[in-house]
């Protein structure tokens, strides 16, 4: 188990913190025109029967009896929280070794596909267990309330956090890191697994002092695949999604595209495809043009550009395979990647990209949690009216039914709501609907904004400071990295803190994506302040 016996803290990574909706969806694949699942018809029938009989309280998810997890482990503090449950630090009673325990509440498994997703995630983790640079599952347990997945504890935090704390950053270091990431992809693909949600925050370190102790986590969207199999479900994170995924016809080549995006971010600090809205990002991805000329691409070698072009080839059949990437001259051992420091603007950009909108997202969560039943009863009725199949989720076709409530929402607000909710899954559940609607609902907006601001400004000074953000992150078990960047992104008068007017401007701005102007202005401030380098 390597370093699993050591103490450590990390954010919500184990619990899919950045997959606001994706946890619920995965794992349908299509061969030709025939849709299949990972489970037999009889298995699906038994699951459906279990749901009808009250799965949430009594029925088994794993399909076999397990010991009581609390007889073997002591569950400690919360490490993260996600849609289906929470992740805790746990200590094995017999050895004293520490692990991470992902607890998935059965009450949150509302349909057959939810149960299948949990089973498949566990199957894939067992299938890949013991492979280098992939988080190791120790065991699974089930009781009447929850399923518990015990895995090794990645105590070193996020890989990208470590990168951004370095004072010197070079192409050679980027090549070493992307070699690890593509090596993980090669391992997955050779074992018949497609990850489908690779992104920087899904790579953690076992040991903060060892940059090569990288572990890939979060297989909640991963699937088994066969050669030639075609997948049609749109999943993933907007900046990293491959064009063929958006076109609903893809295979494992999509993971290579994602790695190419990560490499671009490593070298420049910004993603290759971005816009002010998610739909705008998707348009850029489908267009496929890569910027190698602007000042966002300073002093990068031709060999690195060549590799990125081949990893971000818009045609999957012509895109490099994982083993071909590892043989590229820029990335292989003793390759041509230079050890010369990258342009000094890269690390501030990388930090800014990692921290973008984190304060806004946290603030929206705080507002949503504090809404009274009276404030959300109208939205609840809207959701129920759209949820015609009583599945506790609605599709985007159903979401368009909001137009019948035009007295509350304008057409432009409905479009914004759809973009805010859309993480490429094409569905949204109740909690997600509320959190997305919070930023658009004009009713008593001032009251909600003041409540969120006050959550941070507990001493009533009228300002949000780095220290206050740190305390808020501790309260919510979030990583407190790059707090200065969170301030910097919102601080308009450069006084190092956020006043209420600046906070309101941030919250009311329609910046679901990361626009270049936002980064450019923030970057200029960052360079003036010359900070030392998630």
Curated annotation (Swiss-Prot):
Instruction: Provide a Gene Ontology MF annotation, just one.
Output: protein serine kinase activity
Binding positions for Ca(2+) 3 per the UniProt entry: 457, 459, 461, 468
Recorded hits in InterPro entries, A to Z, give: CDPK_Ser/Thr_kinases, EF-hand-dom_pair, EF_Hand_1_Ca_BS, EF_hand_dom, Kinase-like_dom_sf, Prot_kinase_dom, Protein_kinase_ATP_BS, Ser/Thr_kinase_AS
Primary place of residence? membrane
E.C. designation(s): 2.7.11.1
CDD domains the UniProt entry points to: EFh (cd00051), STKc_CAMK (cd05117)
Q: Which domain of life is it from?
A: Eukaryota
What are the boundaries of the region Autoinhibitory domain? Answer: 337-367
Q: Which Pfam families does this UniProt record tie to the protein?
A: EF-hand_7, Pkinase
Which residue numbers carry lipidation of type N-myristoyl glycine?
Answer: 2
Q: Could you give one GO CC term from the UniProt record?
A: cytoplasm
Ordered alphabetically, the record's keywords are:
ATP-binding, Calcium, Kinase, Lipoprotein, Membrane, Metal-binding, Myristate, Nucleotide-binding, Phosphoprotein, Repeat, Serine/threonine-protein kinase, Transferase
Annotated residues that bind ATP are located at 79-87, 102
Catalytic residues? 197
Q: Which residues form the EF-hand domain?
A: 374-408, 409-443, 444-479, 480-513
- Residues annotated as binding Ca(2+) 4 are 491, 493, 495, 497, 502
Tell me the enzyme class: transferase
Domain notes, please?
There are 3 contiguous domains conserved in the CDPK subfamily: a kinase domain, an autoinhibitory (junction) domain and a calmodulin-like domain. The autoinhibitory domain (337-367) inactivates kinase activity under calcium-free conditions.
What is the protein name given in its UniProt record? Calcium-dependent protein kinase 23
Q: Which organism is it from?
A: Oryza sativa subsp. japonica (Rice)
